[in-house]
């Protein structure tokens, strides 16, 4: 075929050009091209042979390795996808004592009791949370922060008992370790006990790390549990100063702890006298018609104002709603252990004298 293209046409005579035999020259060119073509084919074949041989070596082992790595990756990463799995389930414990039978026929009392499923950390109080509008007109929830505290908390308990009514007490963990007997009185009277951090730190303070914020929450839970003799508090929490850092709201949601804001802030910590507490609460309540009221059993003026405030609530046709958690919140063992480093042993004995000193002879 090459010869037919590069040689003489069929029947053509050889010609000479300037003494050169064109037939001979044509033959030499043709032979050279044939040899060049043969070498090219040989080299190309060798190259294809090397390429074909290299492909199985490079590609075949790589595919199983990649597949194995891909298959192993989800198994390693799976536990991190469910952070709440690290938290213990709610503890099983004896039911809380019921409120004492009411002997006051004119008492404010408790109109209804609601049980809260705290799964996912629902929020209550329209100052921050608008989703769960469960209170009916003229319904009120009484809440008290910062206790327990000598004199003031017992005075609040007496005012509530006199009116056969109840509230939620958000206890500071450190205060609970100072006054465990008072907190036990709160529980024994049938009131709901939530938590309010370990030391009342503002969790929006940028100087606090995330670990420190979590410690404030968790050590507060551990402290209240310790003060109650191993009884876990309700899965209810209120942020100090109503400062809600978003990452801690998420954390409490994973912890299945409900968050409480308020509808009516009494600003009792600013009040110069008991009457001011009553005036502030009733003015806001008459405007809104219902709501969660924020007060402090830590404050002297609140304890003094509460008997008259409860009278005003009854006279105004308001009704008290009791809130309780469907389940308590479990403390975390690492914070239970950490708490033991900070608990201050009581310096005053709570035992009766005759249990300590016994006359054996006279």
Annotate each PLM feature.
Residues 101-210, 216-225, 229-234, 289:
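Active-site beta->alpha N-cap acidic-glycine motif
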Residues 166, 192, 258, 265, ...:
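Residue-level detector of anion-binding/catalytic polar loops
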Residues 282, 286-324:
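Catalytic grooves of carbohydrate-active enzymes
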Residues 10-26:
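Short, Lys/Arg-enriched N-terminal segments with co-localized hydrophobic residues
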Residues 144-147, 170-174, 197-198, 238-242, ...:
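Active-site-proximal beta-strand/loop segments in catalytic clefts of secreted hydrolases
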């Amino acid at each position: 075929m090459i010869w037919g293209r590069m040689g003489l046409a069929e029947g053509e005579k050889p010609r000479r050009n300037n003494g050169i035999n064109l037939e001979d020259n044509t033959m030499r060119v043709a032979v050279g091209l044939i040899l060049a073509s043969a070498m090219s084919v040989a080299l190309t074949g060798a190259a294809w042979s090397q390429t074909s041989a290299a492909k199985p070596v490079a590609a075949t082992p790589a595919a199983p390795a990649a597949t194995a790595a891909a298959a192993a990756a989800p198994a390693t990463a799976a536990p991190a996808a469910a952070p709440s799995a690290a938290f213990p389930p709610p503890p099983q414990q004896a039911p809380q004592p019921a409120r004492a039978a009411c002997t006051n026929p004119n008492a404010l009392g408790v109109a209804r009791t609601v049980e809260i499923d705290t799964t996912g950390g629902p929020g209550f109080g329209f100052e921050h949370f608008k989703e769960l509008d469960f209170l009916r007109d003229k319904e009120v929830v009484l809440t008290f922060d910062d206790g327990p505290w000598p004199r003031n908390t017992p005075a609040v308990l007496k005012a509530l008992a006199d009116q056969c009514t109840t509230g939620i007490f958000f206890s500071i963990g450190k205060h609970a370790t100072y006054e465990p007997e008072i907190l036990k009185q709160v529980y024994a009277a049938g009131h709901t006990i939530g938590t309010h951090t370990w030391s009342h730190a503002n969790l929006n303070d940028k100087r606090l790390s995330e670990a420190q914020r979590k410690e404030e929450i968790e050590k507060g839970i551990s402290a209240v549990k310790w003060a109650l003799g191993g009884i876990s508090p309700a899965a209810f929490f209120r942020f100090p100063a109503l400062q809600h850092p978003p990452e801690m709201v998420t954390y409490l949601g994973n912890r299945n702890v409900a968050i409480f804001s308020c509808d009516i802030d009494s600003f009792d910590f600013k009040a110069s006298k008991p009457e001011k507490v009553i005036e502030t609460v009733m003015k806001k309540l008459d405007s809104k018609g219902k709501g969660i009221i924020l007060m402090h059993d830590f404050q002297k003026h609140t304890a003094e104002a509460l008997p008259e405030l409860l009278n005003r609530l009854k006279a105004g046709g308001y009704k008290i709603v009791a809130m309780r958690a469907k389940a308590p919140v479990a403390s975390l063992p690492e914070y239970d252990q950490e708490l033991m480093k900070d608990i201050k042993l009581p310096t005053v004995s709570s035992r009766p004298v005759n249990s300590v000193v016994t006359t054996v002879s006279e």
